[in-house]
Amino acid sequence: MAAPPHILFAGTPVFAAIILRRLLEAKYHIGAVYTQPDRPSGRGRRPTPSPVKDIAITHQLPLYQPATLKDKGSQAQLAALAPDLMVVAAYGLILPATVLQIPPLGCINVHASLLPRWRGAAPIQRALLAGDKVTGISIMQMDAGLDTGPVVHTARYPIHPKDTAATVHDQLAELGAEALLQCLPSLLEKKANIATLQDESQACYAPKIRKEEAWLDWSQPAVLLERQVRAFNPWPVAQTQIGGKTLRVWSAAALAQTANALPGTLLAVHKTGIDVATGNGTLRLLEVQLAGKRVMTVQDYLNAHTLTPGIVLVKNPGKAKSP
């Protein structure tokens, strides 16, 4: 009886951990796991293992955490594992051409967008910011470019009007696992998968999210600000200044109603929301958070804080206290 295909898995965050868990539940032989080195986390800045590492330890899988795969030592170590196929999901390290050539069946990547749209590090957030109606998963054969390889399989996910980066992430992680499990048998059996070359004319990129992008610019339309709130939940969380303090906005709704007021002006305060004037329309804040406090509904916030219509919320962080 032939030995089962030797799969090497590389991934780091929860997205990848969900996919690894599903592979193990499907009884695939994971010969080794690669994940990023432990990172300082929390107030104590203690080294914290990745979610993928936790699963590897639980299942007693051989585990490797190189800081890079560009040096010959790391490449030789990986080659010695003799993988038939390498599955990559949100690993976070660049795989040099030398590494891509090691598995005879190649390296495949589970990417959280419908390629060639949103190549890069933050496809979920960029799709929400752009107001995309549909996103999805692409299973692609990796090459030397940034998410440029031929696409083996896709699965679509319609974005709900109330979806956040958190909810889309969870949906795509499960969808990615399902998509991978659908095409993996034919990849391992060397059957002819129809890999589609990407249309370069349709390519766009999803650069990593920067913290400063979280500041709400009230001169923008309410629709765009609502997208920003959804795209930056759970990180870095949309925020503004109120009374010289930083207020994080976890949930909001764009309203068509307009007001003859300076963008950022607090228009109305009621139990269902805090209405703020924007460059076009009104943004109703629904869930907020002050520094050092829990996330709360506007009603809970107003039980402890008094707000007066007419004050102006500002974008410039200045000397605002960080959450």
UniProtKB/Swiss-Prot annotation:
GO CC annotation terms, alphabetical: cytosol
Gene Ontology molecular function terms on file: methionyl-tRNA formyltransferase activity
Binding site for (6S)-5,6,7,8-tetrahydrofolate: S113, L114, L115, P116
Keywords: Protein biosynthesis, Transferase
EC number: 2.1.2.9
InterPro entries, per the entry: Fmt (IPR005794), Formyl_trans_C (IPR005793), Formyl_trans_C_sf (IPR037022), Formyl_transf_N (IPR002376), Formyl_transf_N_sf (IPR036477), Formyl_transferase-like_C_sf (IPR011034), GART_AS (IPR001555), Met-tRNA-FMT_C (IPR044135)
Catalytic activity: L-methionyl-tRNA(fMet) + (6R)-10-formyltetrahydrofolate = N-formyl-L-methionyl-tRNA(fMet) + (6S)-5,6,7,8-tetrahydrofolate + H(+)
PROSITE patterns: GART
Domain of life: Bacteria
Similarity section: Belongs to the Fmt family.
Function: Attaches a formyl group to the free amino group of methionyl-tRNA(fMet). The formyl group appears to play a dual role in the initiator identity of N-formylmethionyl-tRNA by promoting its recognition by IF2 and preventing the misappropriation of this tRNA by the elongation apparatus.
Official protein name in the record: Methionyl-tRNA formyltransferase
Lineage of the species this protein comes from: Bacteria, Pseudomonadati, Pseudomonadota, Gammaproteobacteria, Chromatiales
